[in-house]
Amino acid sequence: MKRLSWDIELRCSQCGAPISLEETDRLLICSYCHVKLYLWTPSQFCYCLPALKASSENLIFIPYWRFKGVAYSVIPFEVRHRILDATRLAYSHRVLPVTLGIRPQALKMRFASGEIQGTFIKPQMSLQEAVMRIQNQFEELEGVLLSRPPFHREFIGELGSLIFFPVFIRNRAVVDGILGKVIGPEKDLVIDEAPSGMPDHWQIKPLSTLCPNCGNTLQGGRESLLLFCTVCHVAWNPSSGSLVASKFKVIPGKGDSPVYLPFWMMRVAVKGIELKSYADLARAANLPKMIQSEWEGQEVYFWVPAFRVHPSLFLRLSKQMTLFQPVEEMEAVLPNALLYPVTLSEESATASLKIHLAHLLTKKRDYFPKLDEIIIESAETTLVFIPFISTGSELVHPRLGIGLQRQTLSL
């Protein structure tokens, strides 16, 4: 899925050459020395807007939350989605506007680091609180239009980061560090609890992309959450700050399979609704099939795309895969073909389970009012790569009867 992104500017840690990234990029490749590193942080990524007065002024950095993702709402009687892409002031004193507007799009940001001199104000609200406030604004309007609040809502985040806006004090006034314009009196800026520099847990750490087992260069896309060794057939997860082996499976392709798409296969535990077998799933979704006796003992797996796509396609693919329940033989051997990058985390997939359940239920008037009582959790999760073949402008899986436009993916 093509998306607008903001530009980040940094320098290669090996040769010092300038590198330009998009904000969702995690894999860094220097075009000069060809070093390949994975960018990691113990909390969230933090950026600074460029200050024109940095050379002569003592800068103070004001925090904004930047969040991008999809807000899903279960309403009478459908699942709706809204793409959220916003910034929100994370400072309780209103010396600056509530949002950053278009400035991050017009300027190249830098990663916040210890090299940047100044006083950094800590965010005074969490990312979750900032997202909730935006959602509440939309849903207050929806509540008026619908005469009742949604049955359930979920925010599936694509990214969440801190952006610091530079200001400084001059003649007892707070001055915009980018434009040099006065934006308020000095008394509106309270920095008593601000750290004097950039805290360590806000800074990035570059990780090696060499396989810990064999030393081979790991493979992955610019936004990959997992990296793969095609020599020793291991998936490596860098989310903890070191490369940790992660389990995966592959459904082998037959014939020409140009691309393998990743899905999270999740064995679920459900309370509040009868959903212990594939037969229960078939009845809940009112599948136009005769219920087979062996289905009563077949476990239920939810299949969630492990890559970001448009919300409507995200729901459709999950519903189709979950209702079909692929049962092909799987192996832990990486194919000699394109692996589409894993860009949706297991945590986000787990958070989306109730939304997918609501989407596939047929008797929505019966089940939607009870959604708060329904608990659905992942008991076991495995990453599975499924082969798709190219037919003109589409990628299809003939046996599953599932297809999607190539233009919806970054291929």
Region roles according to the model:
Residues K2-Q14, P18-L21, D25-L411:
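Long C-terminal interaction/binding lobes of large macromolecular proteins
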